[in-house]
């Protein structure tokens, strides 16, 4: 029972991994889940550099996982542009 509870909690926290860590991932492109595309609130990203505004932050283009992302050179583990999520 305890193991089941722990697994449920981990599965619930999985989409919010970027709240726990802000590590850069340099490797294969990751997919952006559809629910993140629907969370648009206010523009904090520069649309001229290919970032997509979402919940006071932005996620990186799948075509450019190592750059072209809100004037940064990489993305966090959950596709957030560093330094924009809580601006």
Swiss-Prot record:
Mu-conotoxins block voltage-gated sodium channels (Nav). This toxin reversibly blocks voltage-gated sodium channel in cephalopods (tested on squid giant-fiber-lobe neurons) with an inhibitor constant (Ki) of 15 nmol/l, with no alteration in the voltage dependence of sodium conductance or on the kinetics of inactivation. Has no effect on sodium channels of the two gastropod S.luhuanus and A.californica (which are not natural prey). Disulfide bonds join 45-58, 53-70, 60-75, 69-81. GO terms for molecular function: ion channel inhibitor activity; sodium channel regulator activity; toxin activity. This is Mu-conotoxin cal12a. The cysteine framework is XII (C-C-C-C-CC-C-C). It comes from Californiconus californicus. It is found in: Secreted. Residues 1-19 form the signal peptide. The modification 6'-bromotryptophan is found at residues 59, 79-80, 86. It comes from the Eukaryota. Keywords: Bromination, Disulfide bond, Gamma-carboxyglutamic acid, Hydroxylation, Ion channel impairing toxin, Neurotoxin, Secreted, Signal, Toxin, Voltage-gated sodium channel impairing toxin. The modification 4-carboxyglutamate is found at residue 63. It holds the Pfam family Conotoxin. GO terms for cellular component: extracellular region. The keyword Disulfide bond applies. The modification 4-hydroxyproline is found at residues 65, 82. Expressed by the venom duct. Residues 20-42 form a propeptide. Its main location: secreted. Belongs to the conotoxin O1 superfamily.
